[in-house]
């Protein structure tokens, strides 16, 4: 490998993703980024990393699940059974075409070693984070008021769907000013299902002053 000098453009502590500017006159090749919305359970993937510092290696697996929050609803992680061990964090999760579908992030383990459950940050979220860091040097936060919701399932046109019920809301802030009140039910958020994950994702990357539908 080669060593390069670099400067830090921005860091997102929530995902442990940073944008670096590499200082070089050489032409650098970039990886193709896949649309993580198109991945399916069962798709084959490869996890690249440096487990335990022994050197760059690749492990083989499949997409086990998508939309896992694993304690952080902002992330909606990809779950994979490709071996991810300490040292793999920050490595690429690629599909069979060699395109980036995620960045290896963490594992579920009672021993600290690989037990078949690993997680990666999806590529679409990475693009959002990187774009924000390049433009602003940080992830800007948004606020729509103080409120509490509970997850519910409702029958909508003979179809059971996920939704959020507002159980408490302060009488100030953007959400209240738009007419949201206690016992209101949120069915969709920006044309996506009314789930806590979609709500927090919309809040995280809504531009300041932009509307959330």
Where are these regions (language model features)?
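Short, conserved beta-strand segments of beta-strand-rich sandwich/propeller modules, principally
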Residues: 211-213
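Conserved catalytic motifs of ABC-family nucleotide-binding domains
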Residues: 183-186
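Serine-dependent protease modules
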Residues: 1-162, 167-172, 176-178, 189, ...
């Amino acid at each position: 490998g080669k060593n390069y000098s670099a400067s830090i453009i921005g860091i997102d502590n929530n995902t442990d993703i940073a944008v670096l500017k590499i200082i070089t006159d050489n032409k650098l090749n970039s990886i193709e980024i896949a649309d993580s919305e198109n991945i399916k359970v069962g798709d084959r993937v490869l996890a690249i990393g440096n487990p335990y510092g022994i050197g760059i290696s690749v492990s083989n697996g499949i997409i086990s699940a998508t939309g896992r929050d694993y304690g952080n609803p902002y992330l909606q992680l990809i779950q994979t059974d490709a071996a991810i061990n300490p040292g793999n964090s920050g490595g690429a999760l690629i599909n069979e075409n060699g395109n980036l579908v995620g960045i290896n992030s963490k594992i579920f383990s009672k021993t600290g070693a690989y037990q078949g459950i690993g997680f990666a940050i999806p590529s679409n979220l990475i693009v959002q984070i990187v774009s924000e860091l390049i433009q602003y040097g940080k992830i800007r936060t948004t606020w729509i008021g103080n409120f509490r919701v509970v997850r519910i399932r409702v029958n909508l046109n003979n179809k059971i769907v996920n939704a959020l019920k507002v159980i408490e809301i302060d009488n100030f802030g953007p959400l209240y000013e738009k007419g949201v009140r206690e016992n209101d039910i949120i069915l969709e958020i920006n044309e996506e299902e009314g789930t806590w994950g979609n709500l927090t994702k919309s809040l995280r990357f809504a531009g300041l002053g932009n509307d959330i539908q």
